[in-house]
Amino acid sequence: MAAALAYRWLLCAAGIVNVLPIGGQRHTASDNPSTYNIGGVLSSSESEEHFRTTIAHLNFDQQYVPRKVTYYDKTIRMDKNPIKTVFNVCDKLIEKRVYAVVVSHGQTSGDLSPAAVSYTTGFYSIPVIGISSRDAAFSDKNIHVSFLRTVPPYYHQADVWLEMLSHFLYTKVIIIHSSDTDGRAILGRFQTTSQTYYDDVDARATVELIVEFEPKLESFTEHLIDMKTAQSRVYLVYASTEDAQVIFRDAAEYNMTGEGHVWIVTEQALHAKNTPDGALGLQLEHAHSDKGHIRDSVYVLASAIKEMISNETIAEAPKDCGDSAVNWESGKRLFQYLKSRNITGETGQVAFDDNGDRIYAGYDVINIRDHQKQHIVGKFSYDSLKAKMIMRINDSQIIWGGKQRRKPEGIMIPTHLKVLTIEEKPFVYVRRMGDDEFRCEPDERPCPLFNASDATANEFCCRGYCIDLLIELSKRINFTYDLALSPDGQFGHYILRNNTGAMTLRKEWTGLIGELVNERADMIVAPLTINPERAEYIEFSKPFKYQGITILEKKPSRSSTLVSFLQPFSNTLWILVMVSVHVVALVLYLLDRFSPFGRFKLSHSDSNEEKALNLSSAIWFAWGVLLNSGIGEGTPRSFSARVLGMVWAGFAMIIVASYTANLAAFLVLERPKTKLSGINDARLRNTMENLTCATVKGSSVDMYFRRQVELSNMYRTMESNNYVTAEQAIQDVKKGKLMAFIWDSSRLEYEASKDCELVTAGELFGRSGYGIGLQKGSPWTDAVTLAILEFHESGFMEKLDKQWIFHGHVQQNCELFEKTPNTLGLKNMAGVFILVGVGIAGGVCLIIIEVIYKKHQVKKQKRLDIARHAADKWRGTIEKRKTIRASLAMQRQYNVGLMASHAPGTISLAVDKRRYPRLGQRLGPERAWPGDAADVLRIRRPYDLTKSGQLGLGRTRPQQNPLPPRYSPGYTSDVSHLVV
């Protein structure tokens, strides 16, 4: 007994060792269950029997069932009571450990039993595969966490709608849908798919009007009134069969089901009893084939379990509904495997999206005719070669509304259009009406500001190239119009906005383009350049005028100014020449002044040595050499100064020769007509050059520069200089504030033909054309294009060119002016003659100044002479008086001396010292000093001194070496200090 127990224990241990992973080894097939129960909640006994048969056959299909794996069926009948269905699922399915459940539709419409099954099994993460439930609610994975279905939801018909619209080239539709979950889901699917998968804007369908109604309609008349005023005549209808009958009934009363109207409906609306003839509807292939969907769901489940067995371990399914703590992770992973299936089944290609909804479902395109007879005219099916869904429709088999074989246009073609334009000479001239005017001229058309509330905004008249084109176009294709001016005066450009917080930015257009994109206008007749950015959002006709981009600049001035003779040299060079003259003169003076050989004379010559060169002579010499005038005197004397003089002479020769040659080039030779050679000019490409160029902000030219990578540096430079309007830029070119204006060639050629001072530079670049702008999908596009082509062939466009753009007589006068011979005349050299006149006038002025100055000096000298004469006379009078006084004083002293000679002892010393006073010179009084008697006698002796020492009258003796007086004040002849 003990031995037997030990043997069994060894067998169990060996089995455990075999199944446990060793060292992280991969699991084996024996880790997974060998039997799998598949539950079925079906609505009929036939479905149950087919379910059992399918699983029985599946067990013999080795492609889907691995070895030692067996599937068993567990089925219950769908109950119309959802609560009872839930209990049956728990008691009869979950208790049996089902790994998945296949569920069909309820017994009645709106049955909640399939949803109850999904709630119950989803709580335990048991996958559910629906074979007939198509409500949008089952796509919500927050509620139906483990629900898949082999049929697509109703709102997936929006994908087929878009394919049909693309096939028929309908771009504007009206969507009519119910306000329930499915109705809103189909609208959201339509809009999202249209924007995401249809990159071609031309093929993208836009929703003009959305009509939402409450289910269980009684009347649809109110909505039909709005639909009738819309432009689109293509109606997409999602409604129940009952609501569709009300819609079609009221639409027939408003004559909206006949010729020109297109009705495209879903499956439910297709079965209405009064679906209009010519309507197109969709019918899901195999929609009612429960057997096919049961088989596909079983095989999809087997395919997922097989792959899961080979990749991971599958835990057993939950068994108890009462255990709320059950978390079956294998069920969640099995659901992911199911969503990744892609097999070919009885109902077509079976695959699922992230929501578990069937994709690649095929549809039949049904055409209603002959009172509710359905005819298949196309299919939407899976193409295995292209691996995608393909729409195939036989247009010839379709009978449209009103029993028409021809496809309707899909829109109501209006005959009265809102036309916008913009002021742009010569294409559109705008004139404000006077106060006394009530109507425009015959060649003008009223053009108020668009959507302006001010009454004065209506007082404008327009004429020009585009106005004549619009008048002729309206006659040719038969439409009427209201003409208006652009509200903001701009052609329009796009602004990137992100209003919804999405990752991608949205382009929002302004100006004329914005009015067209927002469908507030029908047509733009203006010089509107065709470019890719605009063509993405609006339609363009064929170009009515081909043009490009060119550069406008002011023609280099040919008019000779008074200083035209100075043009050969720049201002800087002239200044340097003037400075050089005086610098050389100064150096010559210094060299001659300090040279030891600057002054010399010949040996054995009595002549004086030569004088050195002074500064004025040096300046005269420098100017004389420069101006090639003869130098007679004042030349350098030293060798060093003469060497510098020779160098200066060579410099002067080169300067004069260069000046003469350039003077001929500036005044005689042909000058270039433009400063720039074109867009490839290095001065435009080089951002360091001080050359201002600009264009108009947000214009087609501005967009062109943004697109061109090779012009990016140039665009960054000119971006800050761009103007708001072309008119402002052209005026600045005329004034010289702007050197180059880059704009459309038509406008610039017109300006150049009107003003001979303006010229276009270089060849055209960025060639494009002017077209008429229309809304996307406008019915007038083809008609306008054909009319413009006819205008080109008939010569009407050429006539407009001659009338408005090329002013022949003005242009011819400009050409004649250019061809006149370039000879020098008084106008060219008037400045030189005026310079000579200025020199003469300057000399005359200087001589007048010298004469006036000399007269002033003479008058001043006369006053000095008079003052000097008066001073001399006064001084003579004073001297005469002093002489008389001195004589009287001597006489008195003499008398005193005689008296003293008789009594010498009685005379005081003071008297003796004053006996012989010192007399001054003859020319004036002198100060007398005691003891100067001898000097007095030697100077002036009216009396002789006898040998006896007595004075006596007699002749004076000749004076010998008279002593100078001790003090002899002098008198000068300059008495200018006495003149007041």
Curated annotation (Swiss-Prot):
Coiled-coil positions: none
Segments passing through the bilayer: 571-591, 649-669, 829-849
Superkingdom: Eukaryota
Binding site for glycine: 527-529, 534, 700, 744
Keywords: Calcium, Cell membrane, Disulfide bond, Glycoprotein, Ion channel, Ion transport, Ligand-gated ion channel, Magnesium, Membrane, Phosphoprotein, Postsynaptic cell membrane, Receptor, Signal, Synapse, Transmembrane, Transmembrane helix, Transport
Cytoplasmic side: 592-648, 850-980
Gene Ontology annotations for the cellular component aspect, listed alphabetically: NMDA selective glutamate receptor complex; postsynaptic density; postsynaptic membrane
Function: NMDA receptor subtype of glutamate-gated ion channels with high calcium permeability and voltage-dependent sensitivity to magnesium. Mediated by glycine. This protein plays a key role in synaptic plasticity, synaptogenesis, excitotoxicity, memory acquisition and learning. It mediates neuronal functions in glutamate neurotransmission. Is involved in the cell surface targeting of NMDA receptors. Plays a role in associative learning and in long-term memory consolidation.
Protein name: Glutamate [NMDA] receptor subunit 1
Organism (species): Drosophila mojavensis (Fruit fly)
